[in-house]
Every structure is written in C-alpha cells, then in structure tokens.
Amino acid sequence: MRNSAPDADIGLVIAVKRLTAAKTRLAPVLSATNRESVVLAMLVDTIGAAITVPAVRSVLVVTPDDGAASAARRLGARVLADPTPAGHRDPLNNALSAAETAIREECSNIVVLQGDLPALKSIELAEALHAARAHPRSFVTDRHGTGTAALFAFGVALQPRFGAGSAQRHRESGAVELTGDWPGLRSDIDTPEDLVAACELGVGPATSQAISAA
C-alpha cells in the first residue's frame, strides 16, 4: 500500500514473529493451530484499521513468517524479510531497526504499531498520530501501562526499546507518553484476559471469525 495523498506522511511498521512461536500464553484457551489462526487474524485486523488512516503513507511488515508475509501483501502492505540472525540478543528491536532503515527511503516520520491490536479503530490511530505530532518521539502504553502499543518518531531516530517493561524504557529514552483515550489502540493481546478485554471492546472481522472457529 502506498497512499500518495499530499498529507500522507507516515511510514507504519509492524513486526511479527513466527506464528508457531507467537502468543504461547494463550495456550490455556487456544490450541497451537488455533493460536496461529487467531494471531494471523489479529494482524489482518490491525493492518486493516491502519491502512484506512489518511496520514498513513505506507505499511511495512517485518517478519520471518511466510504466512504473515502473504497476509500482509494481500492487504497491500510491503514486507521485509526479518534479517535478524538466530540467537540475536534483542531480535524484536533489531527487526524494527532494519524496518526503520527500509521505510525511511520514503517516509521520515515513522510509527511502530503492535500487530496484535484486534480492537483497534482507525479513528484512535488517527487521533494518536495527531497528538504525536507535537513531539519528536512519543509512545502509547498498553492497557496495563507497562508495555508499548505504539511508538512515534517524527523526523528523528526511532530508538525502539520494546520488550518487557518497554513503557518505562521508552520514557527513560526521552519519548513523551501520550495519554489519550484510545482503548482499542492500547489492547494488545498477550493473555486470555487481554483477549477477553479486546472482545468486550469489539474485535475486527478476521479476529471474530478466527475466535468463532477455534
């Protein structure tokens, strides 16, 4: 997807690990096969919400997974094969840095979005982007306040600090915390409780179908 509108100035990056290794904490409620289906569906709904935001110029998915790559391409996203070598001490942030380099060819303003935001509404992301423009770097925490749902960098280096306790690490790196009321944007999925909370908000069609089929 490439939005050529004059005001479309955001390059959006989503990192996705191998589906077979994703969301193992959902094992109490979903089989391995169903977890893969739900994770892929959440990615589809996340991209689907993001690509309709007028400010988003391009979506780049960085992943080592063929299934995730195919799904992203069908939605019009670009795909970067994750170059992170096996055994890397910080694979997620390495993948994001590689994606940052790739997407800067067309956008100087970059947003990292979690790929498991099935309740994300386009208006929430649009509002968060508007708020983020007031700062060189900013972020939105997850609903627990400890993780990072989105990281924004306008004309400056991304400096991703994702992982456990990432909200505090992004705060310490100088990024400004955005405090808007964006429940869908904050509802990334790690646990069965997170999935229930997202369903209460209302998940996208792909996730709804995958959960119903599980």
UniProtKB/Swiss-Prot annotation:
GO biological process: F420-0 metabolic process
UniProt pathway: Cofactor biosynthesis; coenzyme F420 biosynthesis
EC number(s) per entry: 2.7.7.105
Entry annotated with the keyword Transferase: yes
Key words, A-Z: GTP-binding, Nucleotide-binding, Nucleotidyltransferase, Transferase
Residues bound to phosphoenolpyruvate: 148, 163, 166
Name of this protein: Phosphoenolpyruvate guanylyltransferase
Organism: Mycolicibacterium gilvum (strain PYR-GCK) (Mycobacterium gilvum (strain PYR-GCK))
